Amino acid sequence: MSELKMPQVGASRKEIVANWQPENPEFWEKFGKKIAKQNLVISTIALTLAFCVWYLWATIAAQLNGAGFHFTTEQLFTLAALPGLVGATLRFVYTYMPALMGGKNWTFISTLILLVPVVWLGFAVQDTTTSYTTFMILTALIGLAGANFSSSMAYIGNFFPKSEKGTALGINGGVGNLGISVIYFLAPFAMGSAALGNVFGVTPAIIKGNAVYLANAAFMWIVPLVIILALMTRFMDNLPLEKPNPKNLVQIFGNKHTWALTLLYTCSFGAFSGYAAALGLLVGKEFPEIPFASIAFVGPLVAGALRPVGGWLSDKINSGTKVTFVSLIGLCATTALIAVGVDMHNFPFFFAMSVLTFVCCGFATGATFR
């Protein structure tokens, strides 16, 4: 990379970004801080919306058969698993896309792509002849939203000095992760809103005697996505980053710590994301008498809120290993007790154990990052 120069007062934004040097205190105070914070705000909002889209299917799946579809339990759970599978698989690829295409460019492209499954799903759920194969393609496309996390986290930290990078990443990932709670909280209101259905021209399904506007849960994200795309063009930037070395990428697979952390992250965040996606279907199957939609957001909200606490506690006792170990032991215990709650057909006990599972996942995920 060429030698960086100190921009002059009145320098263009393009010139400032081309000479990005956040570890230079003078540069940071005069030029860097404002631009970095603008990028962080837009990145965080975009990531929050991506998480909303990633869990969009989970809010609709439990209602499909009531709306006139005829999918088996196995098919519904398979569809619920696809967004997580695709998102997790593509995170490795997405991590390197900002360096290859530019952070602003890739954030724009990866967010723009999300409009495809959002619009398509809105029409698909209104047509009961939509095939299982079509829904498989749709849920796979929804999974792209989950991969946005890795590119967002890999890129936004480059704007900040090391002393502030942890806070920036915590805001970006922590707030973004709350998108799961946002979609679970808003979707029931949207699906029950005739006014919103009229705006979008949605045909309601009659489920248990009530008009349910399933497509609203998808269509309501069109405007926020378009707005954030417009803001990206004004307030995000492409930092000059070194292109990834393929040789270094291959070496990652030979590092035993990579595999150990991958396993731990699978057990922590994987458990969280998987259970959050499947919980609505599980309740619908085992406790059909429970109106679960109104409280579905609680577990993901708890996990998201406790994620930074897990990192803080790890720093406090200077051991992410201990926090992770205790959290995973708790996770195993609560998972077993969830099964007990199902066997007993005791929803309060089942739900309490589910929330404790999310508590353990939140602590474990934060500690694993540490």
Which residues does each predicted region cover?
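Extracytoplasmic
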Residues: 38-69, 275-280
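C-terminal membrane-cytosol helix-exit motif in multi-pass small-molecule transporters
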Residues: 222-242
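Helix-to-loop junctions at the C-terminal end of transmembrane segments
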Residues: 90-103, 306-319
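Extracytoplasmic gate region of multi-pass secondary transporters
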Residues: 57-62, 256-308, 369
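Cytosolic juxtamembrane N-terminal segment immediately preceding the first transmembrane helix
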Residues: 2-46, 50
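Cytoplasmic membrane-interface "Motif A"-like loop-to-helix N-cap segments
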Residues: 100-111, 315-329
